[in-house]
């Protein structure tokens, strides 16, 4: 049902890589896909605009998983929504939480010993909203709530103390 509903040449993207020129690519695409007829496909649904105050909390557990991970996920601009923010958010993610020299890792893992690990990730590859995620695993004896409070405090502190020289180092690595 899904295939017949959505799979149509007018709703597809053809990706080619390797040692091929444009002329040959067009000939091969026409040979293999040219006979396929255009079909009507359902109109894409647009994501509703998010209210800034929308919040939710989800807790999940599985008997086979003993550890705890806490995450904060934020709606963030995607390539399709606002490409002008992509580089800045990528730099922010690297600066704040990618690797052992990041601000959150230094503060929460090395200094305060609240987390075993902490990291950030920015994913702009979505049709509508992308995501910016901060996740951490608490040290033994640290509750998820305590760790989330520490994450929030470390984030706020790092933003206040933005270091231009360190930001430049992050940019050079990208």
Language model features with spans:
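An aromatic/glycine/proline-enriched structural segment found at the starts
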Residues: 13-79, 172
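Bilobed periplasmic-binding protein/Venus flytrap-like ligand-binding cleft at the lobe interface
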Residues: 89-99, 150-157
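Active/ligand-binding-proximal structured segments within catalytic/core domains
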Residues: 72, 82-96, 103-106
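Short, surface-exposed beta-strand/loop micro-motifs that present aromatic residues
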Residues: 1-5, 54-62, 136
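M16 family metallopeptidases and their MPP-like homologs
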Residues: 1, 11-17, 68-78, 106-174
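A generic secondary-structure signal for well-formed alpha-helical elements
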Residues: 6, 10, 20, 24, ...
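Solvent-exposed, non-transmembrane alpha-helical starts
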Residues: 27, 81-85, 143-147
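Short, surface-exposed connector motifs at secondary-structure boundaries
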Residues: 8-13, 88
């Amino acid at each position: 049902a899904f295939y017949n509903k959505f799979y149509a040449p007018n709703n597809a993207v053809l990706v080619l890589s390797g040692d091929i020129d444009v002329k040959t690519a067009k000939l091969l695409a026409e040979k293999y896909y040219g006979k396929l007829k255009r079909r009507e496909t359902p109109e894409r649904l647009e994501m509703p605009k998010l209210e800034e105050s929308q919040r939710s909390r989800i807790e999940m557990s599985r008997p086979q998983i003993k550890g705890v991970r806490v995450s904060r996920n934020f709606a963030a601009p995607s390539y399709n929504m606002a490409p002008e923010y992509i580089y800045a958010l990528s730099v922010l993610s690297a600066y704040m939480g990618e690797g052992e020299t990041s601000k959150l890792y230094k503060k929460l893992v090395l200094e305060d010993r609240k987390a075993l690990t902490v990291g950030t990730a920015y994913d702009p590859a979505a049709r509508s909203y992308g995501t910016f995620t901060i996740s951490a695993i608490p040290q033994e004896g640290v509750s998820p709530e305590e760790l989330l409070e520490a994450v929030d405090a470390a984030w706020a502190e790092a933003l206040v103390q933005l270091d231009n020289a360190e930001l430049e180092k992050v940019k050079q690595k990208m």
